[in-house]
Amino acid sequence: MPEMPEVETVRRTLLPLIKGKTIEKVVLWYPTIVATDHDEFLKELPGKKIIGIDRYAKYLLIRLSDNLTIVSHLRMEGKYHLTTEDAPKDKHDHVEFVFTDKTALRYNDVRKFGRMQLIITGTERQVTGIKKLGPEPNTSEFSQQYLIDNLKKKHKNIKNVLLDQTTVAGLGNIYVDETLWQSKIHPLSIANKIPAKKVAGLWENINQTIALAIEKRGTTVHSYLDANGEVGGYQEMLQVYGHVGEECPRCGNIFEKIKVSGRGTTFCPHCQVIYK
């Protein structure tokens, strides 16, 4: 699943491709992708101009004229690509926005898990899935003290807590494994048993890792591509994710893999301390 750095990279690469274009028509090849009323989606969008793209956590917010916004969640394998109206349709293209210049933005999704909805701009924090999200890394709301205080209330393993988007928004399996390894914290550690000093280090590692991953244009380990069809670069910097059975570069012990609430989790059993 694209995590926050990947979605931010999609936003940055998609914006110059479509900003200023006017929608002429919309085609729904697989209507289920649109979670709101299909007829309204098809009726309201023609004539609307793309004025910008924002992002919150893993959600793209495509801003339109007349105070409308398309909220788009890529889920597991959603992608956008710009083509022309007459270009052959890929079997996994499910939604098409045809512009007045006859270019077309297509949403492609092998798994068909992604969703879009049309809302009034400014109401995105009322959208199911967004309204309960916690703060993003590298924001004033995600302070060191916030994370320390939040973890004190959680008697769950730290991996689950960090994947819970109500604690911190935008993290997924890759960056949680990486930041826990950087912080020398075992993924099965109970959140409220981790010393405050270690939580402070975790907070710093989360912020630094997400910032660097955005700088490197995200991580491609499966199918992620940006809006230009290019892979990310952070996969070359992964220290633990995807390295099960290899030596830990810090201590030389062998990385192991376990399941934590159904999620594959790679860690070093020697230098990642378990707090219980």
UniProtKB/Swiss-Prot annotation:
InterPro entries: DNA_glyclase/AP_lyase_DNA-bd (IPR015886), DNA_glyclase_Znf_dom_DNA_BS (IPR015887), Formamido-pyr_DNA_Glyclase (IPR020629), FPG_cat (IPR012319), MutM-like_N-ter (IPR035937), Ribosomal_uS13-like_H2TH (IPR010979), Znf_DNA_glyclase/AP_lyase (IPR000214), Znf_FPG/IleRS (IPR010663). The lineage of its organism: Bacteria, Bacillati, Bacillota, Bacilli, Lactobacillales. Involved in base excision repair of DNA damaged by oxidation or by mutagenic agents. Acts as a DNA glycosylase that recognizes and removes damaged bases. Has a preference for oxidized purines, such as 7,8-dihydro-8-oxoguanine (8-oxoG). Has AP (apurinic/apyrimidinic) lyase activity and introduces nicks in the DNA strand. Cleaves the DNA backbone by beta-delta elimination to generate a single-strand break at the site of the removed base with both 3'- and 5'-phosphates. Binds 1 zinc ion per subunit. A zinc finger (FPG-type) spans 239-273. Belongs to the FPG family. The active site is at P2, E3, K58, R263. Keywords: DNA damage, DNA repair, DNA-binding, Glycosidase, Hydrolase, Lyase, Metal-binding, Multifunctional enzyme, Zinc, Zinc-finger. GO terms for molecular function: 8-oxo-7,8-dihydroguanine DNA N-glycosylase activity; class I DNA-(apurinic or apyrimidinic site) endonuclease activity; damaged DNA binding; zinc ion binding. Its EC number is 3.2.2.23, 4.2.99.18. Gene3D superfamilies: 1.10.8.50, MutM-like, N-terminal. This is Formamidopyrimidine-DNA glycosylase. The keyword DNA-binding applies. DNA binds at H92, R111, K154. Monomer. Its cofactor is Zn(2+). GO terms for biological process: base-excision repair. It catalyses: Hydrolysis of DNA containing ring-opened 7-methylguanine residues, releasing 2,6-diamino-4-hydroxy-5-(N-methyl)formamidopyrimidine; 2'-deoxyribonucleotide-(2'-deoxyribose 5'-phosphate)-2'-deoxyribonucleotide-DNA = a 3'-end 2'-deoxyribonucleotide-(2,3-dehydro-2,3-deoxyribose 5'-phosphate)-DNA + a 5'-end 5'-phospho-2'-deoxyribonucleoside-DNA + H(+). SUPFAM superfamilies: Glucocorticoid receptor-like (DNA-binding domain), N-terminal domain of MutM-like DNA repair proteins, S13-like H2TH domain.
